[in-house]
């Protein structure tokens, strides 16, 4: 098992990664000061049916434990479920010394974290991720719900007390969720650990390789990339924006195709390829785009859909949180491991996106 220490200006906490990580949960709760009054577990239907009772049984405590379960899917990261969770919290007499446990993937981590950030102006919470994708979202304290006009537009920065990454929970994931989460692993390698990138190319030939000791190795390498960036810039005023590599187009694809119709990781994978495609033009460098594209396709990541309106996608990219005064800001790559946030004119993005779309269709 590997423990990773996270240090930000507002809080320090640990990420427990391994096959026995859940055994730490009771100790984490018992060591909290002031002592925890009661616990609300927030989960979704798919995860709850598999793992909720396991977590309840692992909590060897005297305090009341209850659950709030929402339907599964990104579209459930909504104001309606956020409001309903507050209602449940009030009905079950949560107070400022209560604890919320987020049991699920990134959607649940975001929703439960935002409930924790806002209930009585902020209470404690613990992340118990059940997906590979959540190795990114569970660390760093960004919590949010979606708005019909954009993803993660209503939210806060609220760090967890701990992250308990019990890897056996991931074994029930369908292949599309392994692929989705692996995109964020690739992102962390490309922007912050080139050695990990080369290791992935050698050791992860198929998604089936993302298991057991290799999985633990990947998590203990990818999470510190994010941790190091968050330590420098907790509230995304500077270098934390680098973590959005691939997300400008990725989020636009999610919005245009409809939340749930493309996984977050599939969107980010296409977005990273476009960022590399555009980076080669902007920086006049060779980033081996063609080789990268074939590597991505090998894992089953989608191509850029040929029937999408480039004009509509550019409009959605202008709504991205990095955008400033209606100007698109993208994270571009100078070389592997070196990225920057760059202001890009609409026309440049439009021309490049048309060329990228054509390239993805023809080859």
Swiss-Prot record:
Top EC category: lyase
Disulfides per UniProt: none
Summary of the function given for this chain in its UniProt record: Catalyzes the conversion of 3-deoxy-D-arabino-heptulosonate 7-phosphate (DAHP) to dehydroquinate (DHQ).
Species classification: Bacteria, Bacillati, Bacillota, Bacilli, Bacillales
Record gene name: aroB
Name of this protein: 3-dehydroquinate synthase
GO molecular function, one term: metal ion binding
Membership in a protein family: Belongs to the sugar phosphate cyclases superfamily. Dehydroquinate synthase family.
Key words of the record: Amino-acid biosynthesis, Aromatic amino acid biosynthesis, Cobalt, Cytoplasm, Lyase, Metal-binding, NAD, Nucleotide-binding, Zinc
This protein's pathway: Metabolic intermediate biosynthesis; chorismate biosynthesis; chorismate from D-erythrose 4-phosphate and phosphoenolpyruvate: step 2/7
PANTHER family per UniProt: 3-DEHYDROQUINATE SYNTHASE (PTHR43622), 3-DEHYDROQUINATE SYNTHASE, CHLOROPLASTIC (PTHR43622:SF7)
Cofactor: Co(2+); Zn(2+); NAD(+)
Annotated binding of Zn(2+), by residue: 184, 247, 264
